[in-house]
């Protein structure tokens, strides 16, 4: 009976919801793109005091890259391989020690292949990842990545973030036209509205300037330069508490594990042949103190009882060992100020909740888009013309970026427990929907993995989950209370996803062909406008 209702009611309800959504947002939400340039009030750049800067000589680079993390290193190698002179300035060239940026989705691995840097996941004891396992109240389901149509080498990868970054830095520095320097960038140099380079302190503490036709800021989630180039609206919905479980046998080998715990999810995935990363999400911006032992007590009394029994002992041992780290989870929609001579990339530009491990996939996909836009250009010195042309970047990146961003931020809200009964019904419906198999499983997983970055498909599945939850409530008897709860479930689902979509940009996300910048062509030398 439930199956028959599903087959008849679901398509009708989804269609009506989507029509309402497209009609309302397509006609009544004004695109945020207009006026971005005019909203630019406070600029933290400094005006160059060196007079007129000639950036056509041999003493300057074509591109300055600020930051040599995942985005900066990959970008430096990519542009260097295209014969650009690249100057990379990184605050600290020692191996990073982070608790995020350790899971690369299959879609991100495809971008590594496209950029020619797939060898950077070799020789670092990286582990292949073939899907996810979800756990909730004693139930468990396995979600496999839909990899059948891809080469056998294509899968997710998990690793120590620092090892991966060091491999990419070495790859970039191996090119003779890429200069990798340790230094702290203090500010951008601006002359007549165009960014001409940066002011920085080198490793010896000496203040210097560097000039280039294009400066790309990739200085990460703590960026101190982004305010010059975008309108940062950073939210911190939660914090991750990270541990390393040693010699731990996960219930499903070579899979990411998500425990739908109370109050919020727990993640686990292998980062080497002997280590498993465990990330405990703590809602809000304040976490129990690690120093006075509150955190250990929280992990043992609240978190440990909800862990799968296979990892319980390893989890307790990791807590007792005491190597516990925490970091805030940031989310920030891309809201750029198109600026001649400069561009933002990576976490400095756009962030989403790290629940789905999509950050590196977005960054690498952005680099592919930017590389393809810059390849036809021999000369980058016309800042105004280049800036106009690169406005297309913000639209062309949307299919991948908006899909992964929206899914990550929406899924986090769905996966957290709540005192709201309708929200908890949505959580239950999502877990059971993913376990139905067929398109109900492969569709969402292909979105999460970055293999099928289609925003409309994401919206369809999101509301399919909501409608599935309503159908469950109405069977076997649709009492007034259950009908009201179903209405609140649909309303709650809309309240989750619509604000995220609005922040991403409805027009660019669903109707990119209506954005003029979508059609911009590469300018020729001397042009001031893009056709």
Curated annotation (Swiss-Prot):
Its pathway, per UniProt, is: Terpene metabolism; lanosterol biosynthesis; lanosterol from farnesyl diphosphate: step 2/3
Topology relative to the lipid bilayer, per the entry, is:
Multi-pass membrane protein
Gene disruption phenotype: Non viable, sterile dwarf plants with short, highly branched roots.
Q: Which UniProt keywords apply?
A: FAD, Flavoprotein, Membrane, Oxidoreductase, Transmembrane, Transmembrane helix
The protein, known as: Squalene epoxidase 1
Q: Which domain of life is it from?
A: Eukaryota
Lineage, opening ranks: Eukaryota, Viridiplantae, Streptophyta, Embryophyta, Tracheophyta
Q: Which organism does this record belong to?
A: Arabidopsis thaliana (Mouse-ear cress)
Q: Which cofactor does it need?
A: FAD
Subcellular location(s) of the protein: Membrane
**E.C. designation(s):** 1.14.14.17
Entry binding sites for FAD: 70-71, 90-91, 98, 169, 185, 347, 360
Q: What reactions does this protein catalyze?
A: squalene + reduced [NADPH--hemoprotein reductase] + O2 = (S)-2,3-epoxysqualene + oxidized [NADPH--hemoprotein reductase] + H2O + H(+)
